[in-house]
């Protein structure tokens, strides 16, 4: 019998999965239903068209969405832009164009027994069907769609609303969405960006677009650490099995020491520490799964933020912009915690405690931007779909609140600890089991493996 596979979300993960399923659909034929709530297939939040050209954080030569053609995106970009090379950091909207073309191309070349159905709408729940197909996707504005398989291809969840911002909802000087920035700021204004990661860098880039109207920028996070810069290096230069690292998964301290030794050895040989990070990244899922839970918790408390700044890096031109702003006094990067924010007419007064200090400091700004990053704790999610999934017991959070518990190929683990045969997850919340699952190459590989599994499995 012809099968129906429903993919919820048409950002990177959902689009690449749909393209792979079109190329390798189950033998009995399949309807692949791709559902997107934001109005544009292939873009999601990350690659949406915006009035500011946000850059990709990875060079063009390392962003192919098809492992069979490693330079596919580079060739796509070179056909559309002048003088593009593999080391360039290109606009994210162009990558969204590329993903849309991948989907259209896969649809054109699909075998006769595979069909893509595009649906625009919001999925509010996944239902256990009473008969016939095992699941159904419930939508806000139309009848449920019955499915043999449902794949939750959901991207990064939005940032949580911090406790100090609870009374700032709707205030003109507060932005919960870091890309929803006012265009009326001038050099006389001041802005506090809460968070020092990649989202902060995007906000700094957008707020400093006009050289004569750059507001005074402050950024604040608990440790005051910012991402390291990207550079050109040979990602595949290091070879080996990683046995020395895998031998120390019983102890985080020993594992960290071995990682540092590896980075020093690379640099002694004239290499770049980024090569060591790339090597460790490839081993990260195995290392993470073998660490005892007590060591995982220690990593979360003390080391995850350090891993992130080395692992998730900035385009060199964006880092240069940040350094220029710091030297000019237009940007101040701070470490500490916000204690309270009070509205004073059109401004906000921020009381915060510097890291390592005993006394609170005060800062009055014209705008506060929440850039603290995604909220992976699904137990606290207020998204209607996750609330429904949680209440139905179809999904469960991992012990560290890093994302979703999953089995092989991303099969969702339910509240009873059983891996589903019909419900899968593909996206950054795989980090619970893999530590990292946000880069395009990682999600591409997950998508290809899942598509191959679904094509071979007896649905």
Regions found by a protein language model. Name each.
Residues 1-39, 45, 82-458:
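Flavin (primarily FAD) cofactor-binding/catalytic cores of flavoenzymes
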Residues 36-81:
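Redox-cofactor-proximal catalytic regions of oxidoreductases
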């Amino acid at each position: 019998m012809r099968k129906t596979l429903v993919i919820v979300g048409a950002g990177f993960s959902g689009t690449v999965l749909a393209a792979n399923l079109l190329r390798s659909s189950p033998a009995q034929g399949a309807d692949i239903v791709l559902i997107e709530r934001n109005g544009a297939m292939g873009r999601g939040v990350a690659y949406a068209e915006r009035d500011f050209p946000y850059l990709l954080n990875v060079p063009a030569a390392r962003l192919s969405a098809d492992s069979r053609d490693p330079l596919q995106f580079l060739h796509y970009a070179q056909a559309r832009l002048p003088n593009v090379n593999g080391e360039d950091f290109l606009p994210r909207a162009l990558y969204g164009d590329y993903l849309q073309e991948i989907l259209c191309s896969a649809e054109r070349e699909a075998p006769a027994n595979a069909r893509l159905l595009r649906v625009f709408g919001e999925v509010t729940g996944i239902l256990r069907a009473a008969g016939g197909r095992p699941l159904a996707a419930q939508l806000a504005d139309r009848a449920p769609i019955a499915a043999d398989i449902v794949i939750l291809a959901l991207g990064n969840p939005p940032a949580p609303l911090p406790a100090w911002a609870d009374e700032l909802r709707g205030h003109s000087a507060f932005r919960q969405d870091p890309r929803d920035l006012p265009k009326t700021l001038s050099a006389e204004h001041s802005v506090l960006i809460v968070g020092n990661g990649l989202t902060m860098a995007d906000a700094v880039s957008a707020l400093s677009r006009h050289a004569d109207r750059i507001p005074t920028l402050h950024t604040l996070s608990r440790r005051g650490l910012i991402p390291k810069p990207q550079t050109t290096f040979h990602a595949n230069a290091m070879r080996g099995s990683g046995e020395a690292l895998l031998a120390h998964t019983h102890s985080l301290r020993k594992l960290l020491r071995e990682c540092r030794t590896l980075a020093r050895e690379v640099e002694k040989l004239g290499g770049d520490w980024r090569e060591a990070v790339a090597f460790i990244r490839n081993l990260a899922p195995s290392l993470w799964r073998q660490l005892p839970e007590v060591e995982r918790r220690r990593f979360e408390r003390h080391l995850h933020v350090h891993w992130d700044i080395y692992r998730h890096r900035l385009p060199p031109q964006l880092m240069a912009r940040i350094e220029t702003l710091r030297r000019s006094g237009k940007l101040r990067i701070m470490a500490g915690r916000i204690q309270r924010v009070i509205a004073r007419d059109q401004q906000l007064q921020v009381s915060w405690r510097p890291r390592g200090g005993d006394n609170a400091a005060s800062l009055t700004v014209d705008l506060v931007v929440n850039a603290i990053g995604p909220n992976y704790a699904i137990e606290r999610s207020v998204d209607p779909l996750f609330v429904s999934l949680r209440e139905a017991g179809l999904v469960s959070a991992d012990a560290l609140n890093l994302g979703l518990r999953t089995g092989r190929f991303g099969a969702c683990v339910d509240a009873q600890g059983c891996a589903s045969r019909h419900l899968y997850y593909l996206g950054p919340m795989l980090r619970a089991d893999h530590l990292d699952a946000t880069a395009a190459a990682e999600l591409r590989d997950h998508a290809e493996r899942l598509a191959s599994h679904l094509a071979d499995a007896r649905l």
